[in-house]
């Protein structure tokens, strides 16, 4: 199974939406709960965050490949769709 790294920032409204979307998707699809997600707080773990190329949070990598990077103005529905793409890309 592939590993997901999700970079988030404390106080980021898009990151909050991504976490809510992740929880909603896991509630509705048990197989998503099997996918390991490492939620990395950029402001608390800069040593890890600095190793990756992104500008906006949330950003999600699947096995070191960037699959999703948020951008300003995204709606909850857009974020949920992107998080689901990441979860679908993760199973081996």
Annotate each PLM feature.
Residues 19-22, 53-55, 75-76:
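Short, glycine/charged-enriched secondary-structure capping and boundary segments
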Residues 62-92:
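Non-catalytic, surface beta->alpha helical segment in thiol-disulfide oxidoreductase systems
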Residues 52-62:
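Structural micro-motif
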Residues 13-14, 44, 74:
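Short alpha-helical
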Residues 1-31:
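Local sequence-structure signature of Cys/Sec-based thiol-disulfide redox active-site neighborhoods
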Residues 32-46:
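Thiol-based oxidoreductase modules, predominantly thioredoxin-like and allied folds used
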Residues 49:
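A hydrophobic alpha-helix adjacent to the NAD(P)-binding/active-site core of NAD(P)-dependent oxidoreductases
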């Amino acid at each position: 199974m592939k590993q997901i790294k999700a970079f988030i920032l404390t106080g980021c409204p898009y990151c909050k939406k991504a976490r809510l979307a992740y929880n909603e998707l896991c509630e509705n699809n048990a197989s998503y709960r099997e996918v390991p997600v490492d939620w990395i707080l950029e402001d608390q773990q800069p040593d890890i965050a600095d190793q990756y190329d992104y500008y906006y949070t949330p950003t999600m990598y699947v096995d070191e490949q960037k699959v999703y990077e948020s951008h300003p103005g995204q709606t909850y529905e857009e974020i949920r769709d992107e998080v689901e793409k990441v979860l679908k890309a993760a199973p081996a």
